[in-house]
Amino acid sequence: VQRVNAANHRMDEDDVIDHILTADAEKIKSTLEGIDRAAFTKAVDLILGARNIYILGMRSSAILAEFMNYYFGLLFDNVRLIRPAGGSEIFEHLMKVHEDDVFVSISFPRYTTTIVNATEYVSKTGAKVIAITDTLSSPIVPHSTVTLTAKSEMASFVDSLVAPMSLINAMIAYIGKKKHKEVTETLGRLENVWKEYNLSLIHI
């Protein structure tokens, strides 16, 4: 309720489009200016060297996890998306985590106790943890091997995921560049399947 009231106080109906899009653009700019490029490169290297890649995001961050999982699935054969069906079920999946694995923990306000606990649990296994979050004061940061931050301050009651999505997009593109040959082969096979089974909805 406080978020709705605060958003309504900041902008009139006629200003919503300008306010939201401008605020989102500023978040991407601020994220770019503050990005730790060494941490970004380290995160990519950890992912490239992982035995398995586990991804978890909860609440609205689950969308980011799904996006990452979809494209990582084109880049790797060892990706495991943990869907937050319930607290105990999450830990059942995490029991399989090995020290040679990487766990990507995606969490933005409001943080959930479950993902904080899950991140702490994985860190104790010796696996590498990549935290994608809003600030270095996020509760998942103390349990991470490397942290990437993206701005997500809310201009309305809706969580702004534009900057986090852009950061993940950059990570996918960077990994794709490093795995250019494999990506080209995968996409080539995928296009052949589309053509063979007429799966493309748009023909140019």
Regions found by a protein language model. Give the residues of each.
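HTH-adjacent hinge/linker in prokaryotic transcriptional regulators
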Residues: 1-38
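Short, charged beta->alpha transition segments
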Residues: 15, 38-43, 89-92
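Glycine-rich phosphate-binding loops that contact phosphosugars or nucleotide phosphates
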Residues: 48-58, 62-166, 170-180
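Short, small/acidic-rich helices and loops at N termini and domain boundaries
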Residues: 195-198
